[in-house]
């Protein structure tokens, strides 16, 4: 009994596969070695993403639509590739080794990108700020560098945050409390990296050189990796399950379809399930029956012709299906976020960016206000909002995960509505001063864009952190790395969706010689219409989210019941049952 208190209770092991002592491994001690990497990786990513649209238009001579599309496509790839990285980690080599291999690919991509903007033969020549057209070789090398980074991110992004969460034992009441704050502070370190990128790196890129602007985060990544490996003795590792998760997920709907003509028993106890001792002795989690997606229950009907699926296997499939419904309604919010590094930046380049008489703020640096609002909001959320709401609701998180997402989505809609209103104001100034040239500065301060940036940052404290925690918490235990890719892939597809939308909107509105809403000359476009279009589809999407959330049943978790005195799960279930607005 004493030994059970000394060793971790969730079955985590060290790198050699041996049980680990709870007192000497994991928790915040281990996570401290991971936070540095997250900060430098985000600094590298946002150092590229926040100013990439300007590099593509000014150095590689791409037009507005092409540059926005290429930024979205690359960002989308960065967020989509984690699906492969998570699957490899969960099914084959684990999070640590997947991260190790992928981080080296990431660093290689950063080195290649730094070469692409510094080596004379690999970059276009420029004189007095005007660059010659890049050769096919130069463009190809540049994009190879970018997509090498995307491949590396595929293995690092889904595994580093999940690996951090693994450092907290879900069977320990004390450590489970600590995990509640983990994702908030994990994202806080991410925001720090993004802040340095949008404030420091963007300025360095435009004033001291792109090579230095990309070289600094490359060196930072290398240093953070060294720090990461110094912490190896303190890390806890989840044991890789040998089950074929993809096969199991496909097997359930196939079996349910084959049994479609059979009558499902009224009593779920008549469905096929293994003894609980089997799960305990094999280190697996038994999942109890839930009254949702009842058509899948037919896969567990006992028949003489074939071996049925277990209730646990069916419930895992139900859980993934429920996550998919929530995931689908996160795509539009991700499309709104895609504006920050694309159209918001291009919008900013048309405005007066002077501070004082000499200093001119880079348009992409306004993205730092997204990060600043996040940095200010995370401690307030964690230290003030959560304790206050916890007293009101009895929920350890203050509000449910889906309520958190709903608040974030609503704030995003307000932000994009304000962006549309500011663009209307900009067009009035353009008309008043008879501005027609795309290079002519609109006599309107760039700080008019501050509200839309700041609100998106505040919304992200609810939205981004909430999504990451939701998909990790609600995923089946055996596929939590893969579960976090619901978060990353949603962002990725949101970027691809924005790429598709700007392309189609441009084609439709410019058809027959009409004026494109998103033309090369933003001083003669209707960006306000595009933002208004995003507001409309976001409101429709919000309605779909409320409906999907009202139908969602949270994962049953005996440990959560113990942690909250039996109130957490029951409270969330009642909230879902009483009102479709209580999500």
Swiss-Prot record:
Q: Name one Pfam family in it.
A: PTR2
Q: Tell me the superkingdom of the source.
A: Eukaryota
User: Which residues in this protein are found as Phosphothreonine?
Assistant: 98
The compartments listed are: Membrane
A single GO cellular-component term on record? membrane
Keywords, ordered alphabetically: Membrane, Phosphoprotein, Transmembrane, Transmembrane helix, Transport
GO MF annotation list: dipeptide transmembrane transporter activity; tripeptide transmembrane transporter activity
**Gene3D superfamilies attached to this UniProt entry:** MFS general substrate transporter like domains
Q: Where are the transmembrane segments?
A: 74-94, 99-119, 134-154, 182-202, 210-230, 320-340, 361-381, 405-425, 446-466, 485-505, 529-549
Q: Which GO terms describe its biological process?
A: response to nematode
Q: What's its membrane topology? A: Multi-pass membrane protein
Q: Which InterPro entries match?
A: MFS_trans_sf, NRT1/PTR, POT_fam
Per the entry, induction is:
Down-regulated upon nematode infection.
Instruction: Give the tissue specificity.
Output: Expressed in flowers. Detected in stems, leaves and siliques.
Q: Hey, which family's this protein in?
A: Belongs to the major facilitator superfamily. Proton-dependent oligopeptide transporter (POT/PTR) (TC 2.A.17) family.
Q: Could you identify this protein by its name?
A: Protein NRT1/ PTR FAMILY 5.1
Q: Give the organism the record lists.
A: Arabidopsis thaliana (Mouse-ear cress)
| Gene assigned in the entry | NPF5.1
């Amino acid at each position: 009994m004493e030994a059970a208190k000394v060793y971790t209770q969730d079955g985590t092991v060290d790198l050699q596969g041996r049980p680990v002592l709870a007192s000497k491994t994991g928790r915040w001690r281990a996570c401290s070695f991971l936070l540095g990497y997250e900060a430098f990786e985000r600094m590298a990513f946002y150092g590229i993403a926040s100013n990439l649209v300007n590099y593509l238009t000014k150095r590689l001579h791409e037009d507005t639509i092409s540059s926005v599309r290429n930024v979205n496509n690359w960002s989308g790839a960065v967020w989509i590739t984690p699906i492969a990285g998570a699957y490899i980690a969960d099914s084959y080599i684990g999070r640590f080794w997947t991260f190790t291999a992928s981080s080296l690919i990431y660093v290689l991509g950063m080195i290649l990108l730094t070469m692409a903007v510094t080596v004379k033969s690999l970059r276009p020549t420029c004189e007095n700020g005007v660059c010659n057209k890049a050769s096919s070789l130069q463009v190809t090398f540049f994009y190879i560098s970018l997509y090498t980074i995307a491949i590396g991110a595929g293995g690092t992004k889904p595994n580093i945050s999940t690996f951090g969460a693994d450092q907290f034992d879900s069977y320990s009441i004390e450590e489970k409390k600590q995990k509640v704050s983990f994702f908030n502070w994990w994202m806080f370190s991410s925001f720090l990296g993004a802040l340095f990128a949008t404030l420091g790196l963007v300025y360095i890129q435009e004033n001291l050189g792109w090579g230095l602007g990309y070289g600094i985060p490359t060196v930072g990544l290398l240093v953070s990796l060294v720090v990461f490996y110094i912490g190896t003795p303190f890390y806890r590792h989840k044991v890789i399950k040998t089950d074929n998760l993809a096969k199991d997920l496909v097997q359930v709907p196939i079996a349910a379809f084959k049994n479609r003509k059979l009558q499902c028993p009224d009593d779920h106890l008549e469905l096929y399930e293994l003894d609980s001792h089997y799960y305990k002795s094999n280190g697996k989690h038994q999942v109890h029956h839930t009254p949702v997606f009842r058509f899948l229950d037919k896969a567990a009907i006992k028949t003489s012709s074939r071996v049925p699926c277990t209730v646990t296997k069916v419930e895992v499939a139900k859980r993934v299906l429920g996550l998919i419904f929530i995931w689908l309604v996160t795509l539009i919010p991700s499309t709104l976020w895609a504006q920050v590094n694309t159209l918001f930046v291009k919008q900013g380049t048309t405005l007066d960016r002077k501070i004082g008489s000499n200093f001119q703020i880079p348009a992409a640096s306004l993205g730092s206000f997204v990060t600043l609002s996040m940095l200010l909001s995370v401690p307030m959320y964690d230290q003030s909002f959560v304790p206050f709401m916890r007293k009101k609701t009895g929920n350890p998180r203050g509000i449910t995960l889906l309520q958190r997402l709903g608040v974030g989505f609503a704030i995003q809609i307000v932000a994009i509505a304000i962006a549309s209103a500011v663009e209307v104001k900009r067009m009035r100034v353009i008309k008043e001063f008879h501005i027609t040239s795309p290079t002519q500065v609109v006599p309107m301060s760039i700080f008019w864009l501050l509200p839309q940036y700041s609100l998106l940052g505040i919304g992200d404290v609810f939205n981004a952190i909430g999504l990451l925690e939701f998909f990790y918490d609600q995923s089946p235990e055996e596929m939590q790395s893969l579960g976090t890719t619901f978060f990353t892939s949603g962002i990725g597809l949101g970027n691809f969706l924005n790429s598709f939308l700007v392309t189609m909107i441009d084609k439709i509105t410019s058809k027959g010689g009409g004026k494109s809403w998103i033309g090369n000359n933003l001083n003669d476009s209707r960006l306000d219409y595009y933002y208004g279009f995003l507001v409309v589809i976001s409101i429709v999407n919000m309605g779909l989210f409320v409906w999907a959330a009202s139908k969602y049943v949270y994962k049953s978790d005996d440990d959560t019941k113990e942690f909250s005195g039996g109130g957490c799960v029951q409270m969330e279930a009642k909230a879902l049952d009483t009102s479709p607005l209580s999500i």
